Every structure is written in structure tokens, then in C-alpha cells.
């Protein structure tokens, strides 16, 4: 729930909050099944959270964020090692009044050693961006994720939450304001990387499986 409300996407606003050690420490003391936790690094308390999760061997990932370079650099130094659904729910290069600023996307590119994942369904990201991620981050630092909902592989005939619609091979908000989730399966991601982004098959399979 520790996400920037401005970048929450289709998350329920009422569940969003800043990290609270009285919540996450008891939880993580009682279980060893959590292997990764995604969080917005600019939130108050996020660095203490990342230090704690790192001490537990849990991957902490940047997500749903407006963080710029200094914030990403500091987050990486603390223990944020990965960017979740790269490009989605995070800004790129942008302008505020007359000045231009790097976004989270450029900041992650500049952070050597930070790994990324992409929703390679050809809808969340176009082939040109998939090529760019592959070129700049490389097969060693990139993985493919479906980010799929429970409706994965459905064709739109299955009744779903009325807030969403299935259209053009993806789940969207009913008002068409945003994508709401993927319907892709892993084979679709590999096929997209090979056929649309012209990535070698062996690298596409590696990014989908390692």
C-alpha cells in the first residue's frame, strides 16, 4: 500500500499510505514468504523500510513513483535494486514551467546496476521502447513480466468488475482513462520481443525465465 497517490493508477486510494514500521516489521517477523516488496521511494519512511527489507533479504523495487534522479540515486544506495513495470506508473522527461527535468525513467537508466522489468505485451509499451530498454539496460538487467490480472487470456466475454473493460487485448478503465492491467501470458511476451522488437530469441527467453 506504500505508493505515491499521484501515481497510484488503478489502485484503491483508500488503501494507500506511507510506510509504517508498526505494520511491516511485525508482518515480516512472522513470515519468510515475502521475497519482494514494491514501494514509492520518495515517501516519508521509505528509506527506513528499504533498509529493513534489505536486512531480511527482500528485494525492494521502485514503483508508482515520481522520483527524480537524486531520489533514485539515494534509493539505490539504500537498497532499492529494481524498477517495477518500467515506464508504467512513472514519469519520463518532463517540463515544469520553462524548465526541463529528468523523470524516473531516465534516472533508472542512469543508475548502473538497477534492474528493470517491462510489460512486454506490445500494448503497455511499444516495440520501440522495448528495443530501447534492451539496448540500454541489456539482457542481464531486464526481465519480462506479464503484470497480468486474473482475467489473463480472456477475450472480453467473461463478466468482470464494471469499472473495467477488456478491449484490444488489454484491460482498461471503463472510461478509457488508463490501462488497468495486462491479459498477457508469458509466451505472448516472448513472441512480442522477438517478432516486434527484433530481440534474439535466446535473449527473449532468458529475460522471461531467469
Regions found by a protein language model. Give the residues of each.
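Short, flexible active-site loop motifs that bind/organize anionic cofactors or intermediates
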Residues: 14, 36, 62, 176, ...
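Aromatic/hydrophobic pocket-lining residues that form the small-molecule binding cavity
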Residues: 20, 24, 46, 186
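Generic structural "secondary-structure junction" signal
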Residues: 4-5, 14, 18, 92-95, ...
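Active-site core of metal-dependent hydrolases
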Residues: 25-154
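His/Asp/Glu-enriched, well-ordered alpha-helical/loop segment
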Residues: 100-118, 134-146, 151-210
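A polyampholytic, Gly/Pro-enriched intrinsically disordered region
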Residues: 12-17, 84-88, 163-168
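Divalent-metal coordination cores built from histidine and acidic residues
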Residues: 1-32
